[in-house]
């Protein structure tokens, strides 16, 4: 059975690139434009991994991670940050919120697939 990955980013172009890359590698992909949309979608869709941007309107990536981690069913859900932020302080905030890993944009498609395979198979 295919693994399902949720990609959360306010940039349609970025969601399209991530989705294209992961679908090409055999994953199902669910998209959300911000953290609030992601929370709504994840309530009705089982996902094996969340890949989220940091800076988004309505609900940012750190808030999304904290809210997901507060739900018992999602405490161990792998969550990757995919963002332009490369600052060590931001990475520390991400880890403290519960992020599993961090990938800096622009991303290398092969590296993204490799990380996703390591994290969720």
Predicted regions and their residues:
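Receiver (REC) domain active-site loop signature in two-component systems and cognate sites
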Residues: 56
């Amino acid at each position: 059975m295919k693994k399902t990955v949720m990609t959360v980013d306010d940039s349609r172009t970025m969601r399209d690139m991530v989705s294209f890359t992961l679908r090409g590698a055999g994953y199902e992909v669910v998209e959300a434009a911000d953290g609030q949309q992601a929370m709504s979608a994840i309530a009705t869709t089982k996902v094996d991994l969340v890949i989220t941007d940091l800076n988004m309107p309505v609900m940012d990536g750190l808030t999304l991670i904290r809210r997901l981690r507060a739900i018992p069913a999602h405490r161990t859900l792998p969550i990757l940050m995919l963002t332009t932020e490369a600052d060590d302080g931001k990475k520390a905030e991400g880890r403290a919120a519960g992020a599993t890993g961090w990938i800096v944009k622009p991303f290398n498609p092969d590296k993204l697939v490799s990380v996703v395979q390591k994290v969720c198979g």
